[in-house]
Amino acid sequence: MGCIKVDPPYWWTGMRDSTLQLMVSARNIGYAEFSVNYPGVRIDRQFRLDSPNYRFIYLTILPDAKPGVLRLNYVLGGRKSAIRFSLHERDTCRRGAAGFDAGDVLYLLMPDRFARGVPADKRVRNKGVASLTHPTTDDRENPDARHGGNIAGIREHLDYLDSLGVTAIWVGPVLENDMPGGSYHGYATTDYYRVDPRLGTNDEWREMVEVAHRRGLKVVMDMIFNHTGSEHRWLKDSPSADWYNHPAGDKMTNYRLTTLHDPYVSQYDLDRTVNGWFVPSMPDLNQRNPEVMRYLTQNSIWWIEQSGIDGIRMDTYPYADMQAMSKWCADVLREYPDLNIVGECWYVNEAGAAYWQRSNRLNTRETNLPTVMDFWPMANARRAFGEPTECMGGLNEIYDHLAQDFLFPDPQRILTFLDNHDTDRFLCEAPETEADLGPWKQAMTWLLTTRGIPQIYYGTELLMSGTKVWTDGDVRRDMPGGFPEDETDCFDPAGRTPLQREAWDFLSGLLHFRRGELNDVIAQGSLKHFMPEDGVYVYERRLGDRSVTVLMNGNDEPRKIDTSRISEILPPGSVRTDIISGEPVRVEPEMSFGPRQILILV
């Protein structure tokens, strides 16, 4: 019969949901009959679907069940045997599942490209890699190959992230991607219960999260439920004929997410969007199959309980079945009410993104999704902060974008970002002079002081640049100094260029200000802004009698403004402190601004 695999590999007592699905896989195990004799645990039902190589067992774990090892006894072909299955005690004292919100700043990193550390046990690592069908080798000269970063490298640089000033880490996918090519990005899962051994082990992941928590850093885990990798065992031997959509791989998605809210959509177009494969190496899971969705839901809960992650970023969210994902959100949040989930809803228009946020009256169906990603700045901020603020251009675009927030049920629960691993970097080309940093500084200032949950992409603090013109790998370059053979170490201030030091210090200063005593003003405060006039954009965040006021000149030339129009937030003669310079600023009837100058007044 060969090796028997049980998913999940273990579980816990005391969970809110007492039902547990076990997927047992082995040759002809579908014909086995299972029984259990363990206090507080019973088998409610068991069955196989189309494949003889899977058996689904539904257990009820009663509140009085104790931690221990139970025996799943079974009879197959007249022979008796048993599988040992552990029930663990929940660690109710451990930090984790705390969620993330507008008081946080997420730092997105790709494990393969951030840093290579020393694995906890090289023998375990080597054995794990040897078990892969496509182990691959590191090739740092190839932008689309593995470069060798790992979980140990993240753990070894948590102090760097803390010193930078971020409060949460969004870690790109870490689960097994046993694929013949392109596996470094992690978005083609081949085992939902195993960290890719090239990145580390399940224990190393849990320990990294624990160390991050001790440093006051939250961890957000990237998950992918729309599709698997084409090398997943399910595609070769599906538990049921409808486990995947179009299992022959003859239909790709049309990527037209507008079909999901188009009142005139054809069924053909809608089906193509949701049921087509994302790419030929990423077959589309059928979330309408209840066994698929139960498996995926339990997998989420298992990783939260196993490692104590604080949030989930769900990839390609709208491409999965809306009703099934709505139930997934509800089920996960019922078990972990403080957790936050952000869905990748790739719309560059505000209405499309808002449609997916929970409690949206524009959507006749409830999504239960707390947080959505705001792709508009990714598509438009480079232009808005780079061109002159004249007529309707420049910072007027930022003003107009925020004016669309009426579409969102909760604008503070929008993940706002300028770039990520799937997009051109905000800096397509590296700046050469300090003057070139003007638009970048203004974009960072806005990102960290506007409404919502800001996310920055690794290397932003070092002015990393790149575009997707030739390859995705150009926007996923290695972090300088993350690998022992690197000649330049930008984790060390001494390894940074003068321009990088200027950028790092500026961004770090903003981040530390944001997580300081006025954090709640930015996280919870109201937002009031004024249309740019004479090229200067002004907005205020206020909570009670405390405020943060931002003024920025969106032009490359000096400008003056009449302050009477903003007197409702900056009374004439009042004195504030600019947190960038540390100098007092008196509100005069007329104020002058240098090219691209920023004031952050408290």
Predicted feature locations:
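Immunoglobulin-like IPT/TIG beta-sandwich domains and homologous Ig-like subdomains
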Residues: 16-78
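Substrate-binding/active-site clefts of carbohydrate-active enzymes
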Residues: 114-301, 306, 325-336, 340, ...
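Active-site-proximal helices and loops of the catalytic beta/alpha 8
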Residues: 209, 213, 227, 232, ...
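Low-complexity, Pro/Ser/Thr- and charge-rich linker/hinge segments at domain boundaries
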Residues: 87-108, 113, 117
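C-terminal beta-strand-rich structural cap/linker in extracellular carbohydrate-active enzymes
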Residues: 586-602
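Edge beta-strands of extracellular beta-sandwich domains
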Residues: 80-88
